[in-house]
């Protein structure tokens, strides 16, 4: 099943916004990340202390509008390299926001939603997706694209490239548990992990 573009985009924007809001309510400030001058991001909102900066997810569209020279990020190169068409939900998911990992809770356990931190990270992500799909093809398994990691070692959450369904799979193995009919439905069912203490 395919999520409508607007529904999936809004689900991602809403969940990332509420993640930041929950962090502010719990800790009195936005999420923080260890600062790396060599790894700038439009998500970076300045110093929290000597080693950490505040961050917040940013819509990629707003970054592109702010810089007329910035081209919209796409997966055309990935599709060309693999000679396949990626499911629309996969492309929407990874081109909606720049963000750090967003921790979440599902009925099946804890997970971290993966996003690109900056343009270079987006390119690294594309390379990882190409590697993942090539592995799937070599193993003659259904082609999937991962978008989240779980608290269980080697267990990832992915989208079936043909159906758009969300599944759990062990790295190198066939998907073994269906979680949702679509990515938008899956994200809409997530809740925010109740963080006991702030990560440094």
From Swiss-Prot:
Q: In its keyword annotation, does this UniProt entry include Signal?
A: no
Topology term for the membrane: Peripheral membrane protein
* Chief place of localization: membrane
Where is the protein localized?
A: Cell inner membrane
Sorted keywords for this record are: Cell inner membrane, Cell membrane, Membrane
Q: Which InterPro entries match?
A: Syd (IPR009948), Syd_sf (IPR038228)
- Any Pfam family matching the protein: Syd
One cellular component term from this protein's GO annotations in UniProt: cytoplasmic side of plasma membrane
Q: What does the UniProt function comment say about this protein?
A: Interacts with the SecY protein in vivo. May bind preferentially to an uncomplexed state of SecY, thus functioning either as a chelating agent for excess SecY in the cell or as a regulatory factor that negatively controls the translocase function.
What the record says about family reads: Belongs to the Syd family.
Q: Which NCBIfam families match?
A: PRK04968.1
List the protein's name: Protein Syd
